[in-house]
């Protein structure tokens, strides 16, 4: 089984992670790559809005719900913890998986530090993709550039 290509786009809140990811997704899509994004939310997100059937079902005690149509599905499962590696398994056909956030993960990452928003790095410098090794690897990847 081929190892998944996974890397993170990290930074503090409002640093531009989503903006960068959306721009990268456009480029990767134009290159014909299938890319999935896993986003970490440290605030226990609400997966649905009041008034929907699945929201009502979750509020009434369902430990999980799924909604699907001909072209997509959404799965919500009440579970104490799941790793990004386990979530990546939901996307076996992905050429690349981007992680949004995950500043403390062990995956290689790009950290966004933006003037007026973040003064210094919050990530492990050994995992940042700025070393000679990572730069050479990215430059040699004609399928990504």
Q: Model-predicted segments: where are they?
A:
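Single conserved hydrophobic/aromatic residue that forms the stacking wall/gate
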Residues: 133-145
């Amino acid at each position: 089984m081929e190892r998944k290509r996974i890397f993170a786009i990290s930074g503090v809140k409002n640093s531009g992670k989503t903006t960068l990811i959306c721009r990268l997704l456009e480029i990767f899509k134009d290159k014909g790559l299938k890319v999935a994004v896993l986003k970490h939310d440290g605030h226990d997100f609400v997966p649905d809005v009041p008034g929907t059937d699945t929201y009502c079902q979750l509020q009434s005690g369902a430990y999980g719900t799924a909604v699907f149509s001909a072209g997509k599905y959404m799965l919500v499962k009440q579970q104490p913890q799941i790793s990004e590696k386990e979530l990546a398994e939901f996307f076996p056909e992905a050429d690349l998986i981007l992680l949004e956030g995950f500043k403390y993960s062990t995956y290689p990452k790009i950290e966004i530090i933006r003037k007026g928003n973040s003064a210094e790095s919050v990530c492990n410098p050994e995992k940042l993709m700025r070393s000679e090794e990572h730069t050479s690897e990215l430059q040699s990847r004609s399928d990504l550039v």
